[in-house]
Design a protein with these regions (language model features):
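Short, positively charged and aromatic/hydrophobic N-terminal segments
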Residues: 3-10, 14
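Cap/lid and interdomain-hinge subdomains that line or gate substrate/regulatory clefts
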Residues: 20-23, 59, 122-259
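Short catalytic helix/loop segments, enriched in acidic residues and glycine
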Residues: 40-56
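Periplasmic-binding protein-like
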Residues: 86-95, 114-116, 291-295
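Short, acidic/small-residue loops that bind anionic groups at enzyme active sites
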Residues: 104-129, 134-142, 316-329
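Long, internal scaffold/assembly segments composed of regular secondary structure
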Residues: 242-335, 342-343
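C-terminal catalytic subdomain
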Residues: 318-435
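Extended hydrophobic packing segments that form well-structured cores
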Residues: 389-492
């Protein structure tokens, strides 16, 4: 059967198109059986059709190579799948299949592959069992042989999904997690991440080798200059600024000063400056074709770039919330973590550890920006800050908590061998008071004494920044680790 590609309608995030993940599918069998058992081909083919229907429920584009039962047909399917440039391949074993039928996929397709063995029956009807019935339920018979041939061909043994058809919930969750992991990897494919400025002075954990980053994730790291952003800001018209101000007023609650003496009233000119820079920042991203941006500009006092670099928070928050993650202090690795979290459906805000609360057994996590307002608990607030602690200039900060419920923290750091590694933990966002300091803060519990969790987290070697997202995503991150080859440390 000749391959074809099922073009599904592309879904979009607010503001920016989500790149569609291409999922390959092939169903394999043994042609000799079909000469011996009438109707068996049709019955086994339906297994691939059923799996394709399952894939259509997910946000992906399906490239279905059909039913393959000879090595020669596998060669044809491989060439077609290579043309489609798929991100992941599911191989449905419909019955016993000689490993020669699967070997071409192992040898010639440089993409993660998953072996599927879904047995129709929970058990054979032993008193009425026939050879035909056994062949219809021999989905796992060849799996050891097929898995072994990957190793003999110098490839990693593929992960396997083995279940009876009645285990529908398990099958769906496994498929969904693998597709989410493939989507996270595809988020970097043929993409460009911007790097504006330099890392915050002295933050060794922020320093990243751009070539090592490309080796790990695939995306190109493009060096940008603050003067380009300055030029774009000068080109913003008064009408564009007014429209952005109206947009900001619609999204945010503008707050008066709090008890913190660093807070101040948000004046019209403050809002106008942030709005103008927001328009320019969006244009910078679009003109350079960026999927994410890491930025930091120290700025000398009263330098003409100081107001520009100090008033990025509204713009970077709007971009992050629309699907283009921005990471402050030029944290390239956390920009990647935010992009992964976005692809997994968790949103992804820029965060670090703030003070903990032993009485409530929570830790506050947040930052002065950038943030993802799509996962906030209620309307986000704006506060004017007379100064940023540790940074130059003054400007408007964003303040909110993540909505209550499950959360995931994802940090990406570098190990002693210079390799990227992920550190992740799952917790719970809880309601309650947060400081009114123009920063985000979320009260997070981890189901154990908070000081013990923090010890384990710090001892795992993360960067001090991380992506904070809603939902529990470690199961999908495990699969992303398999696909990407980036190790994962789970902190519990």
């Amino acid at each position: 059967m000749l391959p074809f590609c099922d073009k599904m309608e592309k879904k979009r995030t607010e503001g920016y198109a989500m790149k569609q993940t291409k999922i390959g599918l092939v169903t394999v069998g043994h042609y000799i059986y079909f000469e011996q058992f009438e109707g068996l081909f049709e019955e086994l083919s339906r297994k691939g059709e059923a799996f394709a229907a399952l894939l259509r429920e997910e946000d992906c584009e399906i490239c279905n190579a059909g039913y393959i039962d000879r090595p020669e047909d596998a060669f044809t399917a491989v060439r077609a799948l290579k043309r489609e440039d798929i991100d992941l391949l599911f191989i449905v074993l419909s019955t016993y299949v000689p490993s020669a039928v699967c070997a071409p996929f192992a040898k010639y397709l440089d993409v993660s592959q998953i072996l599927i063995g879904i047995q129709p029956l929970e058990h054979l009807d032993y008193s009425h069992a026939t050879t035909y019935m056994q062949l219809c339920n021999d989905d796992v018979c060849a799996m050891p042989e097929v898995a072994g041939v990957y190793r003999r061909l110098g490839k990693s043994i593929p992960p396997c999904i083995i279940a009876s058809a009645s285990m529908e919930g398990y099958i769906r969750s496994q498929v969904r997690e693998w597709i989410a992991a493939a989507r996270a990897m595809a988020a970097f494919k043929y993409e460009t991440i911007g790097y504006l400025g330099h890392t915050y002075e002295g933050m060794y954990d922020m320093n990243t080798d751009p070539t090592a980053f490309t080796a790990a994730f695939g995306a190109h790291v493009k060096m940008l200059e603050i003067c380009e952003l300055s030029r774009l800001a000068e080109e913003v018209t008064e009408e564009e600024t007014k429209r952005k101000i109206a947009h900001v007023r619609n999204i945010f609650e503008i707050c008066d000063p709090s008890i913190d003496p660093l807070t101040d009233f948000v004046k019209d000119e403050d809002l106008a400056l942030s709005a103008r820079i927001s328009v320019a920042l969006k244009r910078l991203v679009e003109q350079n074709g960026l999927c994410a941006l890491a930025y930091y500009y120290k700025s000398e006092k009263n330098n003409p770039y100081e107001p520009l670099s100090a008033n990025l928070i509204i713009g970077n928050t709007l971009l992050t919330s629309s699907g283009i993650p921005l990471a402050g202090e030029a944290d390239l690795k956390t920009a990647a973590a935010m992009l992964i979290m976005k692809a997994l459906g968790g949103g992804g805000s820029f965060a670090e550890i703030h003070p903990f609360d032993t009485e409530s057994n929570v830790v506050l996590v947040g930052h002065d920006g950038p943030h993802h307002i799509g996962i906030s608990d209620g309307k986000p607030r704006l506060r004017k800050l007379k100064k940023y602690h540790g940074k130059s200039g003054s400007g408007i900060g964003v303040e909110f908590s993540l909505r209550s419920g499950p959360i995931t923290m994802l940090s990406i750091s570098v190990d002693e061998n210079g390799k990227m590694q992920m550190i992740a933990a799952e917790g719970e966002s809880l309601p309650g008071e947060i400081p009114q300091t123009g920063n985000t803060n979320t009260r997070v519990s981890f189901g154990c004494p908070i000081h013990e969790f923090l010890c384990r987290w710090c001892e795992a070697g993360p960067t001090h920044h991380f992506a904070l997202g809603i939902g529990h995503h470690i199961a999908a991150l495990r699969k992303f680790s398999v696909i990407s080859g980036i190790s994962l440390i789970e902190v519990k």
